[in-house]
Amino acid sequence: MTDAFYASPLPGILLWAALYVSDFLFTMLCARMYNDGAANQVHFEGSYEITPYYQKEVDALRLVSPRFLLALAATCALQLALWWMTIRVLFVPQLFFFALGAMVLIEATVHIRHLRNFFLFRAILAKDGITGRIEYARPVMLRMSAVELFSFSAAYGVIYLMTGSWFVLGGVVSCLLVAINHRQLAQKHVPRTTRFSATDNTENTAL
């Protein structure tokens, strides 16, 4: 199966693009569910979107997003350049699979989070066995994200030790780096002095 990735950059680009688009659509779907009522029981301080680059887009539920299209084009171009340099110029395919794994496995990890939120929010909206209300300050939300990503990095690390896969090693590193970033964001967060309504689309959001 890996032969297809050696022969052409297209399989890697298509895989990445499919995951990236799916990530964005899942984010918008869960953000809408959150704003439609899930936030009345599970409320997160600040934006639903953790990544600052996308927060305004997600807060506005902007499905057609120039920022997203620009990022998609840039990352696909990056993957094309990585394939050309590692496979055709340097002849070090391990580096390509490391980079591919870093991109794909962080997205796979994020998709697990999306699925968790989707089923949680669906249960809340259906009033299916979830009662009460809980609020998370943004630093707590970011620390939770960091712990989750550290855990995935460790899990991928165990798989790497058993397989020696450069693809999996890429996932170890990318999850670790994003976890560190979220931890740093939590430490830098300045608490809000104003409390916002759970139905305000511009300030309401979640993990």
Cite the ranges covered by each PLM segment.
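Hydrophobic alpha-helical segments at protein termini of multi-pass membrane proteins
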Residues: T2-L207
